[in-house]
Amino acid sequence: MENRRIIRDMHCVSNKLSRQLDNLFSTQGITHMQFAILSFITRSTNDGKDVFQKNLEISFDIRPSSVSSILSLMEEKKLIKRVSVKNDARLRKIILTKEGSKKYDDVHAKVVMFENKIKSLFSDDEIKVFFNVLDKLYDYTEE
């Protein structure tokens, strides 16, 4: 094998994929993180769970002030609403608006198409090997 560097190559591919995804999101008028939050709220709501700011802070490992800023922008874009909870006035449940739900559906369809294009480059066996390698790298980085 030639003088290839795993970390450098992973970093380059990651940057290129991130740029392509960022372009996809920007053409839809949202950021990658806003889409991730729309996705989280959609999945949680479908599972019958309420979503609060603290859930987002923990799930995405980001600071409360950052989450608050992102949510404020999403409220301005009418993608979400924060509503008070009856039994605790301090808590504000985060819900998708109709616009937010439509935006999620539209962007999610484009993300699925993007992922399917990538998957089409590989055989089923190559995809299995790829995920095995990713799992090992993920486990290694958790040590």
Regions found by a protein language model. Name each.
Residues 23, 73, 136:
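Alpha-helical DNA-recognition elements
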Residues 53, 71-72:
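Short, hydrophobic-biased segments on the C-terminal half of alpha helices
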Residues 21-63:
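N-terminal helix-turn-helix DNA-binding core of bacterial DNA-binding proteins
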Residues 1-28:
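N-terminal leader segment of winged-helix/HTH proteins
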